[in-house]
Swiss-Prot record:
GO terms for cellular component: DNA-directed RNA polymerase complex. Gene3D superfamilies: RNAP, epsilon subunit-like. It holds the Pfam family RpoY. Keywords: DNA-directed RNA polymerase, Nucleotidyltransferase, Transcription, Transferase. One of its GO terms (molecular function) is DNA binding. It is an enzyme of class 2 (transferase). This is DNA-directed RNA polymerase subunit epsilon. The lineage of its organism: Bacteria, Bacillati, Bacillota, Bacilli, Bacillales.
């Protein structure tokens, strides 16, 4: 399993505004599994980044680091 950081907007009907970008962390095997896990939410996904090594350790230090488990 890997941890992915998902950058998204809350409403897929609206134009993307960088200042409104939100993030969530999802543990999954692939990016495709992350997309399937989030498909029922009304998110406009901008980008999905796989976190590894030093980048993952850095993100873990954030107060907002809360990982959801993809099913």
């Amino acid at each position: 399993m890997a941890v992915f950081k998902v950058f998204y907007q809350h409403n897929k009907e609206e134009v993307i505004v960088r200042e409104h970008t939100q993030t969530i962390y999802v543990e999954a095997q692939t990016e495709e599994q992350v997309r399937r896990y989030l498909k029922d939410r009304n998110f406009n996904i901008e980008f999905i980044a796989k976190l590894e090594g030093a980048h993952l350790e850095y993100e873990k230090q954030s107060d907002h680091f809360n990982v959801e488990q993809a099913e």
